[in-house]
A protein has these predicted regions:
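A juxtamembrane structural motif centered on a specific transmembrane helix
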Residues: 32, 216-217, 251-284
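Transmembrane-lumen/periplasm boundary regions of multi-pass, lipid-linked membrane glycan transferases
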Residues: 2-4, 110-113, 120-124, 137-142, ...
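Hydrophobic alpha-helical transmembrane segments in integral membrane proteins
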Residues: 115-131, 270-285
Length: 285
């Protein structure tokens, strides 16, 4: 059915997996000078260059807008920390106060135009997600604290969607796009629907603690990759795919390492681990 799926059943999760790894790979490339061994450093440079070129050539072909947004946000964070773009921006604002407002207005217009273009690229798909999110919020309102139970989303969604259509509030476009999805295509809404606000807050607490640890240890690649995965999860269902869950566990585990340990042990070993994950995911399909 699909020509470009990698080790996955469709291009979406494949693109999301690549988008999640890319910021970490970018960080490895930017800090290759910290590796003392000459041959290991050359190997890292070669692997990173090949990997990034392959990723950048594959991602556009997947037509996954969520993955595009994820890789842009995750990589932007890594680059901003490595090149201290925030400090450079403050200096620019201080030196060119008159140009600040027009520059930000132009940037805002560019971002708005980009978002509109991405929306109309696959309009029906975007409208379908909006419908799923709307119906999922109805489930959360009906079961706010403990949700419908793990694995109960599909049945609850069918009932909530039927009630929404019976109410007469649905548009013709929504009736045309209606389906019976197994996922909310937004992991945060999905978690809230199945485990309630209590489960969602516990999950958000884990994420906040992990981000704080990673940021404190200056692990920009981990923060970037985790940000990319969470961005992708706002538009897809990565937590229902074991490869993405394994990647999430690896990223959360890396958040607690100190910076020296990260440089000494993770830089090259993590590339090997991720390669093994990709190989096993292909063999187990």
């Amino acid at each position: 059915l699909y020509k470009l799926t990698g080790s996955f059943q469709n291009p979406g999760p494949y693109a999301g997996f690549l988008a999640t790894i890319f910021p970490l790979l970018l960080q490895f490339f930017l800090q290759e000078s910290s590796i003392k061994n000459k041959w290991l450093r050359l190997l890292m440079i070669l692997l990173c260059n090949i990997g990034m070129l392959l990723f950048l050539s594959i991602l556009p072909a997947t037509m996954s807008r969520a993955a595009w947004l994820a890789v842009i946000l995750g990589s932007s964070f890594v680059l901003s920390q490595h090149y201290k773009l925030y400090d450079r921006l403050r200096l620019f604002v201080a030196k060119h106060k008159k140009m600040t407002l027009p520059s930000f207005c132009m940037l805002g217009l560019l971002i708005a135009a980009l978002c509109i273009g991405i929306y109309y690229l696959k309009k029906d798909s975007a409208d379908g997600r909006l419908l799923m999110w709307k119906v999922t919020t109805h489930i959360i309102v009906e079961h706010p604290w403990f949700g419908v139970g793990i694995g109960g989303f599909s049945g609850a969604y069918g009932k909530a969607q039927a009630n929404y259509f019976v109410s007469g509030k649905a548009t013709e476009q929504e009736e045309y796009l209606a389906g019976s999805p197994e996922y909310a295509f937004n992991e945060f809404l999905h978690i809230a629907a199945e485990t309630g606000l209590i489960g969602l807050f516990l999950f958000l607490g884990l994420l906040c603690a992990s981000f704080w640890l990673a940021y404190k240890c200056r692990q920009w690649g981990v923060v970037g990759s985790l940000s990319a995965l969470l961005t992708f999860s706002c538009f897809s269902y990565p937590f229902s795919i074991w490869q993405h869950m394994l990647l999430l566990v690896l990223l959360l585990a890396m958040c607690g390492n100190n910076r020296q340990e990260f440089h000494r042990r993770v830089d090259y070993r993590m590339v090997i681990i991720l390669s093994i994950v990709l190989f096993l995911s292909k063999r187990l399909q």
